[in-house]
Amino acid sequence: MLRTHLSGELRKENAGQSVTLTGWVNRRRDHGGVIFIDLRDRTGIAQVVFRNEDVAERAHALRSEFVLRVTGVVEERPEGSQNPNLASGDIEVSVTEFEVLNESAPLPFQIEDSSSAGEVGEETRLKYRYLDLRRPVQANALRLRSAANKAARTVLDSHDFTEIETPTLTRSTPEGARDFLVPARLRPGTFYALPQSPQLFKQLLQVAGMERYYQIARCYRDEDFRADRQPEFTQLDVEMSFVDQDDVIALGEEIISEVWKLIGYEIKTPIPRMTYADAMRRYGSDKPDLRFDIEITECTEFFQDTTFRVFKNEYVGAVVMTGGASQPRRQLDAWQEWAKQRGAKGLAYILVGEDGELSGPVAKNITDAERAGIAAHVGAQPGDCIFFAAGDTKSSLALLGAARGEIAKKLDLIKEGDWAFTWIVDAPMFEPAADATASGDVALGNSKWTAVHHAFTSPKPEFLDNFDTNPGDALAYAYDIVCNGNEIGGGSIRIHQRDVQERVFEVMGITGEEAREKFGFLLDAFAFGAPPHGGIAFGWDRIVSLLGGFDSIRDVIAFPKSGGGIDPLTDAPAAITPQQRKEAGIDAKPKPKAEAQAEAQAEESAEK
C-alpha cells in the first residue's frame, strides 16, 4: 500500500509510531534549514518536518501541490507550537524519507489560502475546477451532498421504497420548458429528448404496481439561464400509490428532517401549511421567506374613494419599514431606482415622523381622512416608513414581496442559522398562458390557459366536476415546500383517470390528436387499472447549497456550467464536424411514420 495512515486522523495517541502519508503540499515554510510542510489529503492536514540534513536538502525543491509520499515518526509538538485549528494540531511527523509522486505546474490561483477564493473569477475557478475542488470548502460541499443522498435513501429504504432508474433518452413531450434534443442516428431525421423530469415514467411505474418508487434523477431543461439555474440538475424524485396529500407531505417532512440533521438542526414537525392565496396576499410570493415578520397590508378598500390618481387602481398595498423615516433622501431615491429595475414606475412612500406627522410625496396628495388613518391601517409607528405599490394585483404584490425582502436585509433581520419552512397548498390549477410566457416559462398547449404545475396534476376533489368549465377558479391538488424563501420541493396528487387527463389537455388547448401522438402511451396505461397516486420532487442542488451555506448551486455541483450555460473546463457546447452532422442525420427529413414502422418491423423480423 502507498500509505499507512491519513493525515487528518493522526493524534497524540499516534506518537512514536512510524507512518507513511500521501498527499499534496498545501504550504511550505523554511525555518533555519528546517522545512515544514502542511501535507493535505481528503481527511485534512498534517504537519511534516524535514530536519534530517539529507531529506531537508531535497525538500527545498518542493512546491505547492506537489504530490508526496512521506515516511516518518509521529511526534508531539513542542509546548506552545500546537495548532488548535487543525485536528492533528498536537502532532507533527518527523520525515525520514520521502518520494515525489508527481510535480505541479505553477498554479492559476492559490489553493491553500481560502481567503483568496473571492478574488478568483468564477470562470477561472470552473476552468480549473479540479484545482478548485482541492480547496476544503469545495470538497466538503460534495461530501455533504453525498451524505444528503445517503440520508434520503435511508429514510426511503425504511419505508420499503424501490430505487428505479428511468430512461434519459425518451421522446419530446411538453413539460414546461424546452427539451434538449439528441439525434437518433439509426432513424435519420428523428430525435430523442433528454427528460425534464421522470414524471411520466414514474407514473407508469405506479400503473405497473411498483407502488413506492424513488430515484436521484438527472434532469435537463433548455431554458434561459436566469438566476442560478443549470441546464442539467438533480432532483430526488418520489412517487407512491394509494396515498393522499397528507401521506406525501408526511414523508417529505421525514426526508427533509433527516437531511437537516446533517448540519445539527432539528426541524419541528409538522411543518406549517399556508394556502397559495394567503402567501400571495400576505407576502407577495408563493415562496415566502418567513425568517422575518414583515407582512403586506392591502389598502385597496382604504383608498376606494381617494382623489390620488396613482391609488385609483385595481390593487393598492403597503409594507412598513421600521425606523425607515430616518432614511436620507438619497436612500429614498435609491428605492425608486430599485423598483424601476424590477419593471415598476417607482415605489411610493409616506414617512411617519416621531411626532406622528406624515410627510413625503404621497402624504401631500391624499385626503385628510386618509392621512389620519393610514398609519393605523398598516400598523406603522412614529419613525417608520410606509412603502406602497399600486396597479394590477400580480405585479403590485410581486413588488411588495421583493420590498419586504430588501427591507429585511437593510434592517439585518435575517440571522445566520435561522431556518423557516412552510408548505404552500391549494395553488391555482391553471394560469393565463400570457402570464406564463411573460415570466419566461413555456406555455403548454394552444389555449389561453396553461397548467401552473404541470398537465398531470389532479384538481382538488371539489373541483373535479367543473375545472374545465371554470379553469380560473380550479385549485390544484398540489403542495410545494419552501425554505427561507426558496422552493426546495414540489409535488401533487396525479391524475389517474383517462377522461380527466383528456379534459385537462382540452383546457390547455391540446387536441385529442396531439394528446394521442405525444401522450398516447400514458393515456393507454390509464385504461388498465391505474391506481390513485402522488409524489414529490426535491431540488437536490438547491437543498445542498442551503445546507452548506452557499450562495450558488454551482458550488455543490462537481462540474457545473457557468451562468451562460458554458462549461469553461471542456469548452462545451462545441461545434461538430460535417461528418458528425451527416452521420447524426440532423438535416435529414424523417420518413413517414407508417414507412418507418414497417422498416422497424422488417429489421426486427430479420434479426429473429
UniProtKB/Swiss-Prot annotation:
Write one Pfam family the protein is assigned to.
GAD
Region of interest (Disordered), residue spans: 566-608
Q: Which GO terms describe its cellular component?
A: cytoplasm
InterPro entries, per the entry: Aa-tRNA-synt_II, aa-tRNA-synth_II, aa-tRNA-synth_II/BPL/LPL, Asp-tRNA-ligase_1, Asp-tRNA-ligase_1_N, Asp/Asn-tRNA-synth_IIb, AspRS_core, GAD-like_sf
Residues bound to ATP are R221, D222, E223, Q230, E487, G539, W540, D541, R542
Look up the EC number in the record and give it. 6.1.1.23
Task: Give site residues, Important for tRNA non-discrimination.
Answer: H31, G80
What would you give as a GO molecular function for this chain, any one? aspartate-tRNA ligase activity
Q: Where is this region: Aspartate?
A: 199-202
Q: Which residues bind L-aspartate?
A: E175, R221, H453, R494
Q: Where in the cell is it found?
A: Cytoplasm
Recorded hits in Gene3D superfamilies, A to Z, give:
Bira Bifunctional Protein, Domain 2, GAD-like domain, Nucleic acid-binding proteins
Its Gene Ontology biological processes?
aspartyl-tRNA aminoacylation
- What is the name attached to this protein's record? Aspartate--tRNA(Asp/Asn) ligase
Give the gene name: aspS
